[in-house]
């Protein structure tokens, strides 16, 4: 039986922060911290003197004063976090999160009894709902908010969604602590414990409820957009009857589904939760860096859930253009764009695992790709034992395939063509497959004519009337080599040139790098061949 009790940081409770006979504006700190005898104490007279000296130009740069200033900063941070933890123990994470979001109280000030009362009153109001928080006359710092009453439901809409700078670090700390507490609990979950303990997990301080509450903190900090987008992708993954974001609530579709689900269905649900928990460790790592002084990430690779052949440190996957299945599952594939228009789907060779191949096939089926272009040579496939998933008949999870060779040709780079029939449930789709058997890694094709011929073959693969270009990630060619950066980028750029020979190849490369990663079109010899193809096309156009 799993336990979800959170271990307290120490023995301090809310009552520990109330000190009779002490001025309400005296700075508080934790004495004998990290021991069983820790207690909240008022600042000593000697400390006050050093703090006063730190305000005087003559003394503020002395070693003893500077050391004291740093100690005070650390003390202030520790007691604030301990106080917020005590508040969370009493009122719950949601109330504390909401209070920090709505309140404009300066969290960078030293903790005093006056500040303790102000923050506690905000949390009490938040515990009773946003309306109480706004109506509370003792709440001295509520951001501009508008009440919207619709159909009997009262909601609060923020006129200013940005939180104050002083509230950002506490919100990030809450998210970090929540993740560090809940991830191990999610990793221990199994199908039986999920069925038996779901109500406990999805209420109070249970791991599912706490996780969803803590992750909301990131949505309140504009600078944390990359982190928030990452967790939003994970929360949108379908598990059982609903998206993962709904698994932190009792009494809904998720709970009803769990009651009726088979042992196999629960096992599959837990498997997805485990891979999501593993991905959330990446968020934890980023939050740890921010806590240590790093800036907010400006870019982040999207979650791969174990489906990617290469680590994102080697082959990044831009999460803003990452392709997602209908059930919200992200796949390690990007939509390449040029001049704002989609050109192709691009990825690495699928990882040789059942889950990765099933996701890859579902993507081809759901996106109704105009064709599949495999640029890994026959020699490379054998040397690296890459899956020849596009020829023969296979079953990958829910997807069944049956591929028939249509033609072989030495012209245009030894292209084999297949028609691959895909089926998943009632959905059926047949996709043309072009396998280029003699394109060496990190090198150009044997001739520029072969590159142009291949581009023509791809453009002419127009399955079921699907257009070669689209305004979305549907009906596009899916292209991959081994890593999905060199040959794949070259092939996609050749398609752009066939559309418009006057296209700026440097801009094509820049747009592809923005679309997927900075390694796109990284091989100089392949880029030289693209320029030769462009010159050839321009001469033909001129004549």
From Swiss-Prot:
Gene Ontology molecular-function annotations: GTPase activator activity; protein tyrosine phosphatase activity
Known EC number: 3.1.3.48
Domain Tyrosine-protein phosphatase: 315-543
Record domain Bacterial Rho-GAP: where: 162-293
Keywords in alphabetical order: GTPase activation, Host cytoplasm, Hydrolase, Protein phosphatase, Secreted, Virulence
Residues the record marks as site: Arginine finger: 209
Chaperone-binding, as annotated region: 35-139
Catalytic reaction list: O-phospho-L-tyrosyl-[protein] + H2O = L-tyrosyl-[protein] + phosphate
Highest taxon listed in the record's lineage: Bacteria
GO CC terms, sorted: extracellular space; host cell cytoplasm
Quaternary state and interactors: Forms a complex with SicP.
PANTHER family for the chain: RECEPTOR-TYPE TYROSINE-PROTEIN PHOSPHATASE, TYROSINE-PROTEIN PHOSPHATASE 1
Name of this chain's protein: Secreted effector protein SptP
This protein's encoding gene: sptP
């Amino acid at each position: 039986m799993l336990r979800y009790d959170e271990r307290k940081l120490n023995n301090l409770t809310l009552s520990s922060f109330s000190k009779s006979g002490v001025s309400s504006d005296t700075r508080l700190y934790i004495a004998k911290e990290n021991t069983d005898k820790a207690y909240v104490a008022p600042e000593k007279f000697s400390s006050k003197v050093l703090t006063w000296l730190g305000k005087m130009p003559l003394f503020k740069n002395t070693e003893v004063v500077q050391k004291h200033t740093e100690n005070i900063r650390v003390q202030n941070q520790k007691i604030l976090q301990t106080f917020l933890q005590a508040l969370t123990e009493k009122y719950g994470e949601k109330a504390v999160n909401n209070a920090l979001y709505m309140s404009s109280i300066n969290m960078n000030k030293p903790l005093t009894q006056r500040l303790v009362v102000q923050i506690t009153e905000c949390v009490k109001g938040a515990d009773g709902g946003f309306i109480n928080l706004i109506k509370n006359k003792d709440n001295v710092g509520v951001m501009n908010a508008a009440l919207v009453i619709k159909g009997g439901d009262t909601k609060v809409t923020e006129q200013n969604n940005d939180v104050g700078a002083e509230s950002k670090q506490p919100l990030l700390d809450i998210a970090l602590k929540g993740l560090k507490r809940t991830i191990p609990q999610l990793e221990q979950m199994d199908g039986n414990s999920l069925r038996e303990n779901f109500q406990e997990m999805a209420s109070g301080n249970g791991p599912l409820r706490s996780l969803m509450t803590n992750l909301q903190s990131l949505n309140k900090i504009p600078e944390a957009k990359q982190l928030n987008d990452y967790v939003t992708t994970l929360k949108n993954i379908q598990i059982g009857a609903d998206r993962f974001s709904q698994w932190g609530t009792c009494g809904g579709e998720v709970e009803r589904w769990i009651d009726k689900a088979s042992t196999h269905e629960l096992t599959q649900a837990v498997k997805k939760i485990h891979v999501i928990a593993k991905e959330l460790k990446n968020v934890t790592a980023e939050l740890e860096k921010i806590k240590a002084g790093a800036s907010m990430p400006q870019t982040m690779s999207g979650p791969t859930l174990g489906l990617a052949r290469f680590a994102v440190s080697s082959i990044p996957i831009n999460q803003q253009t990452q392709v997602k299945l209908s059930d919200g599952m992200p796949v390690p594939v990007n939509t390449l764009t040029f001049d704002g228009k989609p050109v192709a789907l691009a990825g690495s060779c699928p990882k040789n695992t059942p889950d990765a191949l099933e996701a890859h096939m579902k993507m081809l089926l759901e996106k109704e790709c105009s064709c599949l272009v495999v640029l890994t040579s026959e020699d490379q496939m054998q040397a690296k034992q890459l899956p020849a998933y596009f020829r023969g008949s296979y079953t990958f999870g829910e997807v069944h395939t049956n591929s028939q060779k249509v033609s072989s040709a030495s012209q245009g780079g030894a292209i084999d063509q297949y028609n691959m029939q895909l089926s998943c449930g009632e959905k059926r789709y047949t996709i043309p497959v072009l396998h280029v058997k003699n394109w060496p890694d990190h090198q150009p094709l044997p001739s520029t004519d072969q590159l142009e011929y291949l581009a023509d073959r791809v453009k002419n693969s127009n399955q079921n009337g699907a257009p070669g270009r689209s305004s979305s990630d549907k009906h596009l060619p899916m292209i991959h080599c081994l890593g999905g950066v060199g040959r794949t980028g070259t092939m996609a750029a050749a398609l752009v040139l066939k559309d418009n020979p006057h296209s700026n190849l440097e801009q094509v490369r820049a747009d592809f790098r923005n679309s997927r990663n900075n390694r796109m079109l990284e091989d100089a010899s392949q880029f030289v061949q693209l320029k030769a193809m462009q010159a050839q096309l321009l001469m033909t156009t001129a004549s």
